[in-house]
A protein has these predicted regions:
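C-terminal non-catalytic scaffold/interaction domains in large multidomain proteins
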Residues: 1-193
Length: 193
């Protein structure tokens, strides 16, 4: 595919693939483009940070940060697969981390690996660029909004910031993980160090 295309070119490629009632609304196409691409003089291209190699490196960095912060908080990190980690014993985890590079969360929400009450301790870690798309999807889909209500979402940038706090403790962790919501600007004050 052409790395730089106009919105009209993109739409002319997308719409024939999803005919009739499957045709995505222009607002969805715009939300996806805003999430993955940038426009320069009307030409859209994939953002550098969204190249497969960059996202792979981000996921590696997030796994390392989860392990490091967990160790500093006194928790042992268990990696159950590339995108699923826990702090503490996986049978009774203190926190559950799901790493994603997209805004696709339905399969995570349906997963029954952990008890339903574990959702309050479940964190979906995603790139900041996906936050707007996820917020858009939650606004448009009441079922998705309801299913994800008890989950916490942390952007990669917030985990990086928390990793830089030299004397992080469990209270600081808990206070800060909600400080950069998926919709809108960060709430409150991010801790300075």
């Amino acid at each position: 595919h052409n790395p730089k295309q106009t919105l009209l070119q993109i739409e002319s490629e997308i719409y024939p693939q999803f005919p009739g009632l499957l045709t995505p609304q222009k607002s969805l196409v715009a939300a996806i483009l805003d999430s993955y691409a940038h426009s320069d003089e009307g030409l859209w291209s994939l953002r550098e940070e969204d190249s497969p190699s960059a996202r792979h490196a981000d996921l590696d960095e997030m796994r390392a940060l989860i392990t490091d912060i967990g160790m500093r908080l006194g928790y042992e990190t268990k990696q159950l697969n590339d995108k699923l980690l826990t702090w503490g014993d996986p049978s009774e985890p203190i926190y559950i981390f799901r790493l994603i590079a997209s805004a696709l969360i339905r399969e995570i929400l349906k997963d029954k690996t952990f008890a339903r009450d574990a959702h309050e301790r479940s964190i979906i870690l995603l790139p900041g660029g996906r936050a707007g798309l996820l917020a858009y999807k939650q606004k448009r889909d009441p079922a998705l909004r309801t299913a994800s209500r008890d989950w916490r979402f942390i952007k990669f940038r917030l985990l990086r910031t928390l990793g830089e706090i030299p004397l992080i403790n469990a209270q600081t962790w808990e206070e800060q993980i909600g400080s950069d919501p998926i919709e809108g600007p960060p709430s409150g004050q991010l801790m300075m160090f």
